Swiss-Prot record:
Belongs to the methyltransferase superfamily. This is Probable tRNA methyltransferase 9B. CDD domains: AdoMet_MTases. It comes from Homo sapiens (Human). May modify wobble uridines in specific arginine and glutamic acid tRNAs. Acts as a tumor suppressor by promoting the expression of LIN9.
Amino acid sequence: MDHEAAQLEKQHVHNVYESTAPYFSDLQSKAWPRVRQFLQEQKPGSLIADIGCGTGKYLKVNSQVHTVGCDYCGPLVEIARNRGCEAMVCDNLNLPFRDEGFDAIISIGVIHHFSTKQRRIRAIKEMARVLVPGGQLMIYVWAMEQKNRHFEKQDVLVPWNRALCSQLFSESSQSGRKRQCGYPERGHPYHPPCSECSCSVCFKEQCGSKRSHSVGYEPAMARTCFANISKEGEEEYGFYSTLGKSFRSWFFSRSLDESTLRKQIERVRPLKNTEVWASSTVTVQPSRHSSLDFDHQEPFSTKGQSLDEEVFVESSSGKHLEWLRAPGTLKHLNGDHQGEMRRNGGGNFLDSTNTGVNCVDAGNIEDDNPSASKILRRISAVDSTDFNPDDTMSVEDPQTDVLDSTAFMRYYHVFREGELCSLLKENVSELRILSSGNDHGNWCIIAEKKRGCD
């Protein structure tokens, strides 16, 4: 069992971060406030370890302490070193440090990547081993309980969100200025802004939908293409603006739950007849329901489905909003450009807001292309999920050949309320919990190593 767990983590954690590490080299993200506060409260001269330091975001928060970082991912450690941080490659299950060597330890977003309970316990015990008696340990893990999202299972696969990475890079490089669209140059992961449209971060390259699938099947991501939809008067523009807000929330980190989607539907309904809208340039919409298969040849039936499950409802004419499937939607999201993309349409589908969704054009969809004529009618909101930025599906639910086998899918074990505290109380007796709580979709605990423990 341990071997299988290690293989899963290698494929869906280590390999993914190693492959995507280059995209973080120029990314300067801010330290989370509570983690920053914890580090700044440590006594001057303290020796602190950041286990799973990544690019070293927290290694220079407090200049009065000495912070050492370590991470399993070599490329991320190299980025941290290039930034002047002290970091090394190591395994959380076998830390290369002597017993009771650190005054404080932080573990931010690491424990949820271990795929079994025993491996999670071992990782925490290792950190407790190298912590001095009276020293404090801070742990952050993803929470299953979310305000606007839900998970049906705790073990999920999540696609790497390149859109988020692009947005954060844009924010860090253009702080204080209005962010505008950029167009990529071949072979470069980051791109300068342009002024042709008002979308926050819009790259003319293909990007993956935020969707995940069963561990027992090959991982993949459906590629999403956005087409510019022309404006036809203020009424139509209002429709697109409202609809665009739904899409931005739906595609990016803030997934809409069912009740929120119903509110969006009510706002959109009086603005535009869906029959006219469907005759305009059509965009690709990825499925949010585990039963949808992009390879079906016929439109999906909506018989027996209540309107509560629909993102888009029937108009007075009884016709559903229809979506065309763009060719090549199941390609690999690896940063490579698959041919020359060209702009299409007059208006901007996404108006200016802080979204960070990578936008690409569907200009190469031709009317006589058989694969482009496949229609997907129903978009379910039932499986709306929440995390940092991605939609997920249970690793136990098998998928058909909807997804590409080479996409970057990360494994996460999302923690139920109280699960992390119970894990420590029942299995790591040398630690006592000082505080616990929820911080932006993460469970956070601060524990102290008991004095007199071996």
